């Protein structure tokens, strides 16, 4: 077999180019049998196809002394090469390169030796020279088949497979219908001769049908190739040799430039790939050095042959920081180095929203080997610096707490002020004599960015519509939202594919990239489903299937199903949590399916509610871990004196009637109301020690820091109680969150932040007393650019909001200095909650409609 294999090169032995073939001579060059062939060059205006051929059939393509393959090249004007197979591979790759714009005609028969019946079915079609050569090679392979059913396998890049699938699978479906062939695109279990980024198009049927399908498939693949520039196909031995060299210790180049070796310890700064060498020194992309090669080992250089020039730059150019530079040069980097032992020491210096002590070191070289933490940054990537710094990074002056409070009031009033009105609150009891000072609670930046992941199922036939031609739709979704979208592989006996949306988010971000992406994907799936059922008439309902980790199902279900029941009532959609046994094969056994059925607006609103709860759950878990570490460093503030028995209300008023006394609680606004960004709160009294509405196994309720009486969402409610059972916030969590009495009723909120649906009002406990919430007033701050979605056309949305919820909705003019509008919603808790949900839905629907200006087709 090896004796008959043919290797082609782009030049003759004399070095002259053969104009007759268009690609050079086909004479064989003697090489070692283990040496791989060099990569083939695809000239401008040419297309390339890769056809898989079993080892047993290679001889039919090559022929004796290469006669067959030579005749094919001469008759088609194509470059045809049989690649060397990897060790143990049962297949070989046949690479075909020819002109894409030149036309030729081929006969679609069984083969050149077809019988009379086959000749009757022959038809002639016009194809390019590249397609014609592909058909000719396939005819040789089909002649070697032992049965009437033949299989053709094409290798293609992952980005080109979408062209074969088409929008919503329409292209591959039409080819199947026209030819009667079985066509599948495989991502897994590929032969070892395929590249890592390849997919395989497999066509099965009789010879005539497969050739017809091959014409259509090759046309799709040819149209998406970049024929206007030179490309490389085939084996890449230089790249493989280069990647293998990364695992060998190469220290000569870097040591010639550096007087001493540079060590990277596990706590120090791990350089990114593009920060290791000066720009323009590496011949390939920046991914030539994997991250793991920089961890716990000497910094290694790439082989000198892979560099365009010898690295003779100084240390600052090579490593982007001067190892032995003075302090001022070291501070030119974007990230400050702070000793770890100073990060958690109490201080009056505020760095961002965190209390830290910035201790100066005289030895800048020693700081390179100390643990450090990145400077907190906001959603726009800007550092949280609230004071000027000199050239050495030292604060020029320290802010007093009074100054901090005044500035934070304006800063916090704008953060999380948009549509942040879910009524979560927590009550504390203060000692009535002390008036201490409350330091601002630890910022969410200390929690760090969290990966927010949402998953949704889609049918296999609609997956192509989400991916788009060459991944166009996925790239646009990423560009629009910033989230990463991954469409899972197709599995046997599974009619669905899993779409995972991932985004790194911070609790301070006012919008969720992952949530926006999942809503756009759902709208896209609805559009695809609608286009396919136009012939069957309108459809009254649609089903969406979200995939939720089993560990997070509780925040969707709620205690006794109270949360999911409330969402069903609010959205009007049927929400069902399926058992693990009903999971499709494409999802893990650690996940469960949340199935939502209803009309499109209702299902979309339900998805918004569910993903909002899942996102809050991610950050609340992180906040709990952070608060457990930092609670000892915080102090609390007593808000009212010993004689006051009135609860504290910030931003909103809620009437509470006590069945025993039939009297209303008094309200007053705190001078520290900046803790509530949207100025909306739910005010009611209860004793923390005997609170029957918080599960004892969950010591920190959702969105609350018991150490500072602070909610991680600035727009949440902040209340104090006036119970006689006073306690101090410095007590252990086990005392603050005692087990509830066995007969205690279920109240307004649970640990997941859900709402009960009591018809007669919400029963609230305060020690041995009870109170019923009869009326709630909530203020919501809405940006001016979103008000058009609230009003709707000719005020239709606003009118619907009032009629459906039954709440009283008043829109106030914007205050001085801001364009945000204040929407006041009042009514029973059920009415206000329904109005808030509808308000969220209207704004989200408007934002989604604006996204249609992006061509997602």
UniProtKB/Swiss-Prot annotation:
User: Basic and acidic residues composition bias: which ranges?
Assistant: 1-15, 718-730
User: Sorted alphabetically, which PROSITE patterns does this protein's record hold?
Assistant: KH_TYPE_1
What Gene Ontology cellular component terms go with this record?
nuclear speck
Write out the ranges of the annotated region (Disordered).
1-27, 644-755
Keywords, comma-separated and alphabetical: Developmental protein, Differentiation, Flowering, mRNA processing, Nucleus, Repeat, RNA-binding
Give the location in the cell.
Answer: Nucleus speckle
Q: Does the keyword RNA-binding apply?
A: yes
Annotated KH domain ranges read: 46-110, 149-217, 451-521, 541-610, 775-839
Q: Which Gene3D superfamilies match?
A: 3.30.310.210, K Homology domain, type 1
Can you supply a Gene Ontology BP term from the record?
Answer: maintenance of floral organ identity
Describe the disruption phenotype. Answer: Floral organ defects such as reproductive-to-perianth organ transformation and loss of floral determinacy.
Question: Spans of biased composition, class Low complexity?
Answer: 746-755
Provide a Gene Ontology MF annotation, just one. Answer: RNA binding
Q: Where is the composition biased (Polar residues)?
A: 645-665, 673-688
UniProt xrefs under InterPro entries: KH_dom (IPR004087), KH_dom_type_1 (IPR004088), KH_dom_type_1_sf (IPR036612)
**Pfam families, from UniProt?**
KH_1
Q: How does it assemble?
A: Interacts with HUA1. Interacts with FLK and PEP.
Write out the function statement from the record: Functions in floral reproductive organ identity in the third whorl and floral determinacy specification by specifically promoting the processing of AGAMOUS (AG) pre-mRNA. Functions in association with HUA1 and HUA2.
- What this protein is called in its record is KH domain-containing protein HEN4
Q: To which species is this protein native? A: Arabidopsis thaliana (Mouse-ear cress)
């Amino acid at each position: 077999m090896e004796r008959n294999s043919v290797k082609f090169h782009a030049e003759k032995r004399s070095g002259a180019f053969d104009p007759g073939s268009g690609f050079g001579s086909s004479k064989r060059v003697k090489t070692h049998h283990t040496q791989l062939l060099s990569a083939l060059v695809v000239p401008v205006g040419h297309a390339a196809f890769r056809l898989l051929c079993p080892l047993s059939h290679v001889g039919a393509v090559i022929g004796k002394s290469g006669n067959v393959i030579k005749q094919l090249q001469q008759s088609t004007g194509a470059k045809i090469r049989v690649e060397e197979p990897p060790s143990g591979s049962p297949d070989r790759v046949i690479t075909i390169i020819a002109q894409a714009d030149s036309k030729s005609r081929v006969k679609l028969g069984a083969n050149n030796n077809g019988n009379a019946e086959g000749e009757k079915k022959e038809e002639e079609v016009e194809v390019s020279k590249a397609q014609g050569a592909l058909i000719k090679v396939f005819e040789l392979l089909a002649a070697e088949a032992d049965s009437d059913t033949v299989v053709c396998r094409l290798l293609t890049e992952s980005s080109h497979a979408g062209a074969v699938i088409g929008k919503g699978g329409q292209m591959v479906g039409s080819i199947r219908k026209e030819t009667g062939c079985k066509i599948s695109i495989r991502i897994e279990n590929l032969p070892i001769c395929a590249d890592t980024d390849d997919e395989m198009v497999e066509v099965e049927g009789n010879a005539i049908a497969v050739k017809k399908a091959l014409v259509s498939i090759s046309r799709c693949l040819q149209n998406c190739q970049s024929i206007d520039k030179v490309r490389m196909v085939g084996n890449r031995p230089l790249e493989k040799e280069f990647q293998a060299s990364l695992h060998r210790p190469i220290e000569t180049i870097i040591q010639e430039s550096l007087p001493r070796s540079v060590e990277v310890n596990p706590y120090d700064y791990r350089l990114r790939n593009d920060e290791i060498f000066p720009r323009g020194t590496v011949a390939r992309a920046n991914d030539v050095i994997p991250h793991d090669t920089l961890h716990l080992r000497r910094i290694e250089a790439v082989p000198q042959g892979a560099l365009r020039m010898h690295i003779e730059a100084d240390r600052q150019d090579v490593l982007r920081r001067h190892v032995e530079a003075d302090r001022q040069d070291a501070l030119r980097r974007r990230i400050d180095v702070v000793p770890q032992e100073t990060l958690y020491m109490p201080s009056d210096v505020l760095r961002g929203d965190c209390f830290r002590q910035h201790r100066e070191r005289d030895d800048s070289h020693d700081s390179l080997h100390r643990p450090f933490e990145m400077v907190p940054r906001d959603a726009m990537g800007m550092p949280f610096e609230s004071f000027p710094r000199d050239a050495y990074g030292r604060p020029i002056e320290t802010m007093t707490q009074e100054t901090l409070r005044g500035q934070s009031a304006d800063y916090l009033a704008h953060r999380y002020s948009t549509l942040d009105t879910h009524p979560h609150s927590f009550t504390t009891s203060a000692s009535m004599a002390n008036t201490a000072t409350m330091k601002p609670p630890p910022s969410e930046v200390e929690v760090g960015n969290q990966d927010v992941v949402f998953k949704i199922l889609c049918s296999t036939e609609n997956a192509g519509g989400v991916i788009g031609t060459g991944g166009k739709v996925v790239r646009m979704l990423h560009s629009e939202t910033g989230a990463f979208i991954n469409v899972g592989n197709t599995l046997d006996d599974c009619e669905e594919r899993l779409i995972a949306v991932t985004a790194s988010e911070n609790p301070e971000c006012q919008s969720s990239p992952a949530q926006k992406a999942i809503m756009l994907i759902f709208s896209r799936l609805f559009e695809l489903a609608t286009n396919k059922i136009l012939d069957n008439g309108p459809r009254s309902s649609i089903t969406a299937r979200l995939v939720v980790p089993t560990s997070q199902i509780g925040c969707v279900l709620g205690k006794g199903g109270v949360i999911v029941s409330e969402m069903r009532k609010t959205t009007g959609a049927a929400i069902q949590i399926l058992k693990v046994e009903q999971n499709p094969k494409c999802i893990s056994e650690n996940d469960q399916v949340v199935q939502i059925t209803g009309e499109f607006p209702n299902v979309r609103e339900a998805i918004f509610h569910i993903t909002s709860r899942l996102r809050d759950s991610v950050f609340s878990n992180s906040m709990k871990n952070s608060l457990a570490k930092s609670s000892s460093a915080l102090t609390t503030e007593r808000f009212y004196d010993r004689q006051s028995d009135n609860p504290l209300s910030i931003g909103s008023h809620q009437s509470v009637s006590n069945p025993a006394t039939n009297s209303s609680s008094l309200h007053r606004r705190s001078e520290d109301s900046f803790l509530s960004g949207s100025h909306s709160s739910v005010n009611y009294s209860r004793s923390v020690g005997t609170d029957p509405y918080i599960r004892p196994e969950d010591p920190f309720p959702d969105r609350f820091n018991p150490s500072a009486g602070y909610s991680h969402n600035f727009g949440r409610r902040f209340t104090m109680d006036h119970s006689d059972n006073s306690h101090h916030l410095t007590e252990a969590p086990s005392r603050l969150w005692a087990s509830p009495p066995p007969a205690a009723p279920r109240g307004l909120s649970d640990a997941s932040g859900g709402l009960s649906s009591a018809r007669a009002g919400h029963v609230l406990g305060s020690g041995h007393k009870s109170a019923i919430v009869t009326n709630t007033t909530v203020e919501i701050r809405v940006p001016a650019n979103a008000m058009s979605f609230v009003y709707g056309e000719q005020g239709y949305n606003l009118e619907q909001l009032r009629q459906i919820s039954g709440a009283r909705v008043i829109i106030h003019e914007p205050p001085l200095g801001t364009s945000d509008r204040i929407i006041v919603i009042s009514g029973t808790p059920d009415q206000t909650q329904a109005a808030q949900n509808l308000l969220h839905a209207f704004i989200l629907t408007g934002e989604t409609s604006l996204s249609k200006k992006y061509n997602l087709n």
